[in-house]
Amino acid sequence: MDRPAVVLLSGGLDSTTVLAIAKSQGFTPYALSFAYGQRHAVELDAARRVATALGAAGHVIATIDLTVFGGSALTADIAVPKHDTVEDLQADIPITYVPARNTIFLSYALAYAEVVGAGDIFIGVNALDYSGYPDCRPEYVDAFQAMGRLATRAGVQGTELTIHAPLMQMTKADIVRAGLALGVDYGMTSSCYDPDAAGHPCGHCDSCLLRLNGFAEAGSTDPLPYRGA
């Protein structure tokens, strides 16, 4: 039986792993990505590669303009913080947090799910190596799921929405191991918040450091060509 599911796909390590997990669990994945004015728009090229390579049944890239609000180093003229080690990452919510981004993305996913007849949505949020983002916590996902069941025609008519966050309690190393076990080629992904024009990752933003640390702890080598490496 066909089990359609919407998978939020940025083109990064986490969302790519989630797409592979959804497929391994027997779902027919419909990928959803966003061109939201992010400075690291190279991730959309990665999302296209990933969706094709992992056999998504459909791939929508929705265009929304979050630069009208700004408020983040990813959508405004604000420098992306750089560090030398994972230990240097700040404990509070960083300036790379995009206001309400996951709420906006999940709202679009609700609409896409209704159109393709999906009762399942997958998102790659993580509560352990998550850089302090408030919309990556378990209580947030639970609350949005409850709202989604009330807010859609499908929910009212009896289709029970489930939001899957399979990476929630995994370390970045766990995520890397899981993806490699499923045959994911991480060389086609993009995680950096501040890549150069050729798409090479900086190696020093929060996302790069967490990714590199994850590969190191997993006993593997990140296949991406980092600047200056």
UniProtKB/Swiss-Prot annotation:
Binding residues for Zn(2+): 192, 202, 205, 208
Origin: domain of life: Bacteria
Biological pathway: Purine metabolism; 7-cyano-7-deazaguanine biosynthesis
GO molecular function, one term: zinc ion binding
UniProt-listed Pfam families: QueC
Cofactor: Zn(2+)
GO biological process: queuosine biosynthetic process
Stored InterPro entries: QueC, Rossmann-like_a/b/a_fold
UniProt EC number: 6.3.4.20
Residues reported to bind ATP: 9-19
Keyword list, A-Z: ATP-binding, Ligase, Metal-binding, Nucleotide-binding, Queuosine biosynthesis, Zinc
Catalytic activity: 7-carboxy-7-deazaguanine + NH4(+) + ATP = 7-cyano-7-deazaguanine + ADP + phosphate + H2O + H(+)
Co-factor: note: Binds 1 zinc ion per subunit.
SUPFAM superfamilies found in the cross-reference section: Adenine nucleotide alpha hydrolases-like
Function field: Catalyzes the ATP-dependent conversion of 7-carboxy-7-deazaguanine (CDG) to 7-cyano-7-deazaguanine (preQ(0)).
NCBIfam families, per database record: 7-cyano-7-deazaguanine synthase QueC
Similarity comment text for this entry: Belongs to the QueC family.
Protein's name according to its UniProt entry: 7-cyano-7-deazaguanine synthase
Gene name tied to this protein: queC
